[in-house]
């Protein structure tokens, strides 16, 4: 929970504000246990010296048969650890596991001006397939668009 509060505070690219991280320890534990007990979801945790520094996950897109081939991918990493290849390793691992779980395509949403993330996603084979204008509205009243990206597994 502390990790979520820190990552949401240090970057404008995540969907929540720090004060919106309101889950209890029990709720977070239940969420993690659901990931551990599912063959259709994965949460990969990156640690350094026993401290949580990042995570990467995949989850099904809905629970419909016609969507069974699709998964959503998400990643977050403390800013101080960006640029060292940790995110790339986590994404490669998660994408491999998603394919092994039977998914045929991975999807994600990224803020359009997050060029470092977009460059990484493109390096891993993701392609942009659309833009959602004014996807997020910040406290200072400005908006950010988001790109939708997809990769065949």
Protein language model features and the residues they cover:
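A short, well-structured alpha-helix characteristic of acyl/acetyltransferase catalytic modules
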Residues: 1-22
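Acetyl-CoA-dependent GNAT
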Residues: 8, 20-80, 91-92, 152-153
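Conserved beta-strand segments that form the floor/walls of ligand-binding pockets within enzyme
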Residues: 45, 57, 72-76, 85, ...
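Conserved catalytic-core motifs of GNAT/GCN5-like acyltransferases
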Residues: 60, 107-110, 122-142
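C-terminal "cap" of GNAT-fold acetyltransferases
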Residues: 71, 111-118, 134-153
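Structural preference for long, well-ordered alpha-helical segments within the folded cores
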Residues: 89, 93, 97, 119-123
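Conserved GNAT acetyl-CoA-binding A-motif
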Residues: 91, 98-109
């Amino acid at each position: 929970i502390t990790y979520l509060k820190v990552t949401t505070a240090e970057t404008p690219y995540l969907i929540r504000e720090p004060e919106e991280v309101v889950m209890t320890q029990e709720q977070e534990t239940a969420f993690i246990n659901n990931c551990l007990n599912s063959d259709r979801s994965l949460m990969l945790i990156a640690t350094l010296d026993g401290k949580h520094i990042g995570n990467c996950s995949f989850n099904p897109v809905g629970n419909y048969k016609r969507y069974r081939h699709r998964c959503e991918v998400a990643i977050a990493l403390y800013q101080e650890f960006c640029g060292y290849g940790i995110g790339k390793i986590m994404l490669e691992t998660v994408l491999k596991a998603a394919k092994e779980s039977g998914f045929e395509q991975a999807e994600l949403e990224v803020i359009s001006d997050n060029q470092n993330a977009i460059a990484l996603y493109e390096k891993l084979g993701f392609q942009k397939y659309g833009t959602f204008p004014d996807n997020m509205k910040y406290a200072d009243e400005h908006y950010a668009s988001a790109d939708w990206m997809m990769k065949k597994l």
